[in-house]
Structure formats: structure tokens, C-alpha cells
Swiss-Prot record:
Protein name: Integration host factor subunit beta
Record field: compositional bias (Basic and acidic residues): 82-101
UniProt entry keywords in alphabetical sequence: DNA recombination, DNA-binding, Transcription, Transcription regulation, Translation regulation
Organism: Burkholderia multivorans (strain ATCC 17616 / 249)
InterPro entries xrefs: Hist_DNA-bd, IHF-like_DNA-bd_dom_sf, IHF_beta
Pfam (any one): Bac_DNA_binding
Similarity remark: Belongs to the bacterial histone-like protein family.
Xref: Gene3D superfamilies: IHF-like DNA-binding proteins (4.10.520.10)
Lineage of origin: Bacteria, Pseudomonadati, Pseudomonadota, Betaproteobacteria, Burkholderiales
Disulfide bonds: none
Amino acid sequence: MTKSELVAQLASRFPQLVLKDADFAVKTMLDAMSDALSKGHRIEIRGFGSFGLNRRPARVGRNPKSGEKVQVPEKFVPHFKPGKELRERVDGRAGEPLKADEPDDER
């Protein structure tokens, strides 16, 4: 699902929201989540999962073209851990083929 598909689904589920308002709501939520993560905070959405940061230590890598050793600095990367309810809901689909173009509300 893309951000624009999420906006469209939000607008269709809540008829009082026009597409512009749904887009604003999604952008505001994503901005707030990005800001929290960039400040090192953890985000927990009960029943869905949590977002946090994982530290990747500095290491020695290789330049693929020259084979030269390159120092790769330490960095933090976003990480998502699904909650129990989400894991169970997804696990209920085990064995079903993945359908990339199937609308979510028809599942």
C-alpha cells in the first residue's frame, strides 16, 4: 500500500473527510513519527507494533569498484517490530499466495 492509497482508503472510510483533509492527516502523522524517531524516541502503537532505532556500529567495508577498504561510520536505522495482534492477523493468512494488486478491503 502506498501513501496515496492509504489517503484514499482513509477518505473512503470516513465520508466526512475530503481527500485533502485525509492527506493532511496522514502527512501530519508521518511527520510526527519521523520527528520522534529523529529525536531518538520510540513509538508504540498498541495492537499494531512499535518503531525504534537500531544502532549499526562502525565497520570496515570495501569499495566494490576498487576493492579498497573504506571506513563506514556508525549509524542508526529505523526498525519496526510488529505487535502480537498484527502478527496473529498476518499469520492467519499463512499459506495464501501473496497478491500485490489485491485491494485490502476485499481480503
